[in-house]
C-alpha cells in the first residue's frame, strides 16, 4: 500500500472514530454541568437558611372563625385560583420524587407546579383540611383537564396527556416568587417537638392516612419574615396505610375499611400508621428502618393534644368538609364516602 493511500485510510478511520469518542465526553460534560448546577442550588439554599436562622419558626397560624373558611378554594382563595380555560405554557419537567410533575406559566406570569398520577385529588382535599385547622399548606387546585402549550413528550405521565397538549387529572400548585424554600425538616428533629401543634399535625397525617412521611415531603419556607414549617406533599392520602403490597392512596374503598385509633393507654394514644415492608421481604434493611421510623409519627401522642385537634376539626360543618372533596373533582358518591369517614374520625377524637 502506497504511503498516500495509507494516509487516506488512516484519516478516514479517524473521522469515523472521533464522533464515538466525543459522545462520552459530551455525556460527561452534561453530567458535570448538572452536578455543578445542583451544587450551586444547594449552596444558595444553605446561604438562605443561614440568613433566615434568626427568623421566628412557626408551624400554625390562627385560621380565624371556622364558619367563614372557604374550603372549596382553600388557602389560595378564589383570587389566586387558576383559570381552567386559561393559557398555560410549558416551562420544564421535574424528574424528582415519584409522581410525574412539570412546571407551567400562565398568561399573568404566575408559575405553577403540575402533578399527575394517583395523588392530585387526594392532595387537593388533604391540604384543605390541614389549612382549616391552622396548618400551613401550598395553594393547591385541581383541574379535571386543561391545555398546555408547547408540551413535549414527557418522560413520565404520558398516559395523562391527550392530543393537542390536553392534560387530565392535574393538581396545580402555585409557586409565588415571594416564597423561598430553605430546606426540609424531620418529624423527630424540629423546633416544635413535644408541642400540641406538632402533635396535632401528627394526628392529621393519621386522619387522612398519609403514609409517606419522609422528611423530603416536609418543607421550610421563608415568607413574610417567618420560617414556616409545613408538610408540602400529602399526596399519599385517603387510601390505606401498610407495606408496599397493602398501602394505597386516593382509594375510598380502602380508606373506609381502615381503622383510625389503634390503642388508648392512659394519657397517650396510638394511631394506625403502617409503612414498613414485611420483614421477610425487606431486601433493603435501610429502607425497612426508615419506614419503621415513619410509623412512630402516629404513636404515643398525648390524649389531650389529640382531643385539642379534634375540637378544632369539630367546628367544621359537613358542607365545608364536602367542599374539600368537591374541590378535588370527586364524584358525588365519593364525596359522600370520604366525608362520612372524616366525620367519623373527628367524632373519635372528640370522644377521647
Feature locations, PLM:
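C-terminal catalytic region of ATP-dependent kinase domains
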Residues: 228-352
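Regulatory N- and C-terminal appendages and interdomain linkers associated
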Residues: 6-91, 106, 311-352
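Sec/Tat-exported extracytoplasmic proteins
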Residues: 106-108, 133-134, 205-211, 346-350
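Conserved ATP-binding subdomain of kinase catalytic cores across diverse folds
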Residues: 75-187
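N-terminal secretory signal peptides that target proteins for export/translocation
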Residues: 1-5
